[in-house]
Amino acid sequence: MKILIMGAFGFLGSRLTSYFESRHTVIGLARKRNNEATINNIIYTTENNWIEKILEFEPNIIINTIACYGRHNEPATALIESNILMPIRVLESISSLDAVFINCGTSLPPNTSLYAYTKQKANELAAAIIDKVCGKYIELKLEHFYGAFDGDDKFTSMVIRRCLSNQPVKLTSGLQQRDFLYIKDLLTAFDCIISNVNNFPKFHSIEVGSGEAISIREYVDTVKNITKSNSIIEFGVVKERVNELMYSCADIAELEKIGWKREFSLVDALTEIIEEEGK
């Protein structure tokens, strides 16, 4: 099977590439070069003929992991380009191919943030044009996935690294409940979804998470206990965002129906991550 990974140098994209490349022919799509990357087959969107190169590759599966979260005060146009225009541009370009386009979306409601809004708009546009495309479109409503060596701007990683270095952690009330999914479990979920693509309709949405919601407080306390940290945890000193979502949890019935099963508990996953990052 031929798989194109959009956003191949990102946290999720790079791990998907490593996970699939031993069993499939994998090519990555990236905006700019990364000298530290170990991925060999890359199409760069800075090249004039990057669309033509995708068509020449003739992927069976396209996984879009490209995302702009707006965490670094990026303008709205940056989020629109990354979260809407890029996936729709690729989807339209492969309209003649019998390929499956898997878009990594979010479980967050569109009024939560501009990121969530633009991600949802991409799916709405895809639904409007999917009848003109030979293949399929699958939207993944991803919950909060995490793993070793994710970006410093990710909540899960920030807490781990501050606890490892015994730095104070300033947070909101911590009463929000989130569905945390370990990256290794997410990769096997992708495997199950790809193995069952023929059973899905032309446009389809799947919720992807652990199926268990825990509070931010419980997550932070678990990290602190495993790291044996001396960090001072300050709940309630950070103001909650406007439209803060207080509960989010995936309904994983469909994932379980196609054979997926979560393997790592929160404690097991965090123990593994902390061992890797603490070396």
Swiss-Prot record:
Entries under InterPro entries matching the protein: Epimerase_deHydtase (IPR001509), Lipid_A_modif_metabolic_enz (IPR050177), NAD(P)-bd_dom_sf (IPR036291)
Statement: the UniProt record of this protein carries the keyword Oxidoreductase: yes
Entry EC number(s): 1.1.1.342
Catalytic reaction(s) noted: CDP-alpha-D-paratose + NADP(+) = CDP-4-dehydro-3,6-dideoxy-alpha-D-glucose + NADPH + H(+)
Source domain of life: Bacteria
Keyword Metal-binding applies: no
GO molecular function, one term: oxidoreductase activity
Keywords: Lipopolysaccharide biosynthesis, NADP, Oxidoreductase
Pathway: Nucleotide-sugar biosynthesis; CDP-3,6-dideoxy-D-mannose biosynthesis; CDP-3,6-dideoxy-D-mannose from CTP and alpha-D-glucose 1-phosphate: step 4/5
GO biological process: lipopolysaccharide biosynthetic process
Family matches, as Gene3D superfamilies: NAD(P)-binding Rossmann-like Domain
Residues the record marks as active site: 115
Family membership noted in the UniProt record: Belongs to the NAD(P)-dependent epimerase/dehydratase family.
Miscellaneous comment text of the record: The functional difference between abequose synthase and paratose synthase lies in the side of the pyranose ring from which the keto group on carbon 4 is attacked in the reduction of CDP-4-keto-3,6-dideoxy-D-glucose.
Protein function: Catalyzes synthesis of paratose and tyvelose, unusual 3,6-dideoxyhexose sugars that form part of the O-antigen in the lipopolysaccharides of several enteric bacteria.
Protein name: CDP-paratose synthase
Species this protein is from: Salmonella typhi
